[in-house]
Amino acid sequence: MDLNGKVAIVTGVSKGIGLATAQVLLARGAVVAGWGRSKPEGLQHDRFQFFECDVRHEIAVQEAFTNTQRELGQEIHVLVNNAGLGIAGPVDGFSTEDWHTMFDTNVHGLFYCTKAVLPQMKRQQLGHIVNIASIAGTTGIENMAGYCATKFAVRGFSQSIFKEVRNDGIKVTCLYPGSTQTNFFDGIPGTDAHSQMMQPEDIAGAIVYALETPFNFHIVDMEMRPLQPKKQG
């Protein structure tokens, strides 16, 4: 897809991978609707518009979608389901509220956003949905059972829906990033983000690579990891 002039929705746009993705999309000529609970600091661009949205609530997603079409036009070409969070802890001491918060954001929010854009993408017979899963969607991790469960769900959802919509000219790509230097690790005891991790810009670059593939070329899954993940010295 030639991204020049195309409309892209990016969830979780305020920081990390979402913010980096919005910036790279803008550099490629896209019009970006940034959805998030807070506006990204320092992102000023005539092709960027922020829409306040908490993806945990379907009515908020529906309102953000309506507002996006009203402001940017009916056609929606790209959805990057990036909004997500991780909370660590052993299952037998885990907060039920935290469990629900992760599923409401990482799984239910992704479903609400995907459901919102699909009718328009089907009318266009053109679209690309990118779901940000995690290495945690491919293997279990001690004290991260809840987060892994959400990302396994994203993986299953992505691999199923791509088969549903491929004949409508809609691509679905699922990314499985390893450790990336973002605020994600702020809430993970014993793990600190460091420069040996991948950078948000690296993941954003991979997203744009998948988006810019020729029409009949479809990248379904992308796993990515840092080459030298341990902090040196």
Q: Predicted segment positions?
A:
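Active-site helix of classical SDR
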Residues: T114, T150
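C-terminal helical subdomain
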Residues: D168-I170, C174-L175, G190-K230
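The beta1-alpha1 cofactor-binding region of Rossmann-like NAD(H)/NADP(H)-dependent oxidoreductases
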Residues: C53-E63, T96
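Substrate-binding pocket helix/loop in short-chain dehydrogenase/reductase
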Residues: P90-V91, D98-H100
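Residue(s) in the substrate-gating loop at a strand-loop-helix junction
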Residues: S134
